[in-house]
Amino acid sequence: MWTYILIFLMGMCLSGCSTTMGNYAEYSQKPFTQITATADLLRGVPDLGQEKITIAIYDFPDRTGQRKPSEKFSQLSTAVTQGPEVYLIQALKMVSDGDWFTVVERKGLDSLVKERQLVRSTRELYDGETSAGTVLKPLIFAGLIIEGGVVSYDSNMVSGGEGARVFGIGASKQYRTDQVAISMRIIAVQTGEVLMTISANKTIASYQAGADVFRFFDLRTKALEVESGAAVNEPTDYAIRSAIEYGVLKMVEKGEKLGYWKFKKWRVEE
């Protein structure tokens, strides 16, 4: 009697899991914008008490060379995104809702210059426009340059788990944390001096839990085996974005303390 009850309960659990996974698969196909916890901190930075700071980013590469971790075989896919400079530009434009930094294009400078040459030659050839009013505006030059990149990716920094089994019924859970580190330095264009350096680390958490049942019934002539589990892995890109945004936040705070820029002071009218 208990055997049939157990089989019925396991069937209900599996049907519930299949329904949940089906709904999740449908949801995962919809695009969404992932918001980090540090994004609100960047938007909440006080207003700048001077003219906007012009800053350039030529490259912010992955310097780790780390491949995706695998216990079975080596993978060709990289563990770190190959475009971290995109997140850095987004973070700079996010400071106080874009009121702090004017970010000039340098990563795609070749494409920008070619397009400007194409516009200029087309105007001269077909429109005959050579007057000063039709000349393209000069490119904005930056006063500061940010150099650096993703400098470290350490996998399996901390791992562990626990489990128990009684009369063929067991449950277990496992966890693992990786760590990614970024480093950036701010350079003055006029002198080439490194004004400050910033480093930030972010852990990447993974968690797995499962349960299983293995029982014999009908005088040990038949066996029942059921397994169920789920795993949650924090996206690597999310961790890199968080580390970069935190680095930009610390850069703003450190630069204000060193006197490179200042927060806007509000005057209370009497």
Label the model's feature ranges:
Residues 1, 171-174:
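Intrinsically disordered, low-complexity segments enriched in polar/charged residues with Gly/Pro
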Residues 1-7:
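Sec-dependent signal peptide recognition
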Residues 13-16:
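C-terminal motif of bacterial Sec signal peptides marking the signal peptidase cleavage site
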Residues 18-51, 154, 161-162, 174-270:
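C-terminal/domain-edge helix-coil "capping" segments
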Residues 34-44, 72-73, 85-88, 125-134, ...:
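N-terminal post-signal-peptidase region of extra-cytosolic proteins
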Residues 53-54, 58-156, 179-183, 187-196:
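N-terminal segment of the mature soluble domain
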Residues 74-79, 122-125, 164-170, 203-206, ...:
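Short, low-complexity, polar/charged sequence segments that are solvent-exposed and flexible
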